[in-house]
């Protein structure tokens, strides 16, 4: 009888731990937006986005500080609504997409700032250089798809900024843009 009670208690501890373990999600590339804007010669802001976004999120709702995120952007997917400018941005003057095909962000720490908000610090790797960047993140919601109760989605919005000069984007000043680049991010992710 003691063995049965002990076995039940041990099993209960493992089940309790599993109930509070982080959930894994895959970013839905059809519902992911990584936008940016930067100074355009003082006239206004130049806007753009990356069309190819992928990544994973490990989301621990019980202790958000134990969560992690990894995102990859295909540099060649940059879109500024101007094909000539897109081609120039992909060149060695800016993103050098042929030599550095991916831009990545990998979280290193998370600080909870509210019930649904956090500061996510991570390493942004651009042009082969990694620097810390802080994102202000809001968890928007999580629910099953209205047309498919077996598919669970969660959604996040984030903002942040960095200096393109810190990553060696060589020609920003020559074209009167930057150096600061503001990020505007919205992602939906599907629970695995």
How does the language model describe each region?
Residues 1-6:
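Bacterial N-terminal signal peptides that target proteins for export
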Residues 11-12:
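Repetitive helical segments and hydrophobic/amphipathic motifs
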Residues 16-18:
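N-terminal signal peptide c-region/cleavage motif recognized by signal peptidases
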Residues 20-192:
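Low-complexity, acidic/polar, glycine-enriched regions of mature
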């Amino acid at each position: 009888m003691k063995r049965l009670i002990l076995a039940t208690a041990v099993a209960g501890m493992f089940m309790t731990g599993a109930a509070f373990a982080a959930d894994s999600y895959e970013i839905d590339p059809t519902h992911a937006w990584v936008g940016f804007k930067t100074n355009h010669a003082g006239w206004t802001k130049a806007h753009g986005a990356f069309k190819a976004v992928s990544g994973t999120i490990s989301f621990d709702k019980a202790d958000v500080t134990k969560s992690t995120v990894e995102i990859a952007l295909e540099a060649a997917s940059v879109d500024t609504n101007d094909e000539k400018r897109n081609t120039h941005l992909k060149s060695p003057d800016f993103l050098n997409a042929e030599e550095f095909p991916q831009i990545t962000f990998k979280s290193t720490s998370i600080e909870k700032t509210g019930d649904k908000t956090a500061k996510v610090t991570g390493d942004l790797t651009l042009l082969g250089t990694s620097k810390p960047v802080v994102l202000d993140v809001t968890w928007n919601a999580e629910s099953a798809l209205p047309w498919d109760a077996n598919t669970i989605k969660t959604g996040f919005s984030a903002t942040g900024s960095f200096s393109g000069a810190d990553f060696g984007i060589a020609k920003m000043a020559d074209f009167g843009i930057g150096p600061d680049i503001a990020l505007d991010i919205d992602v939906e992710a599907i629970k695995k």
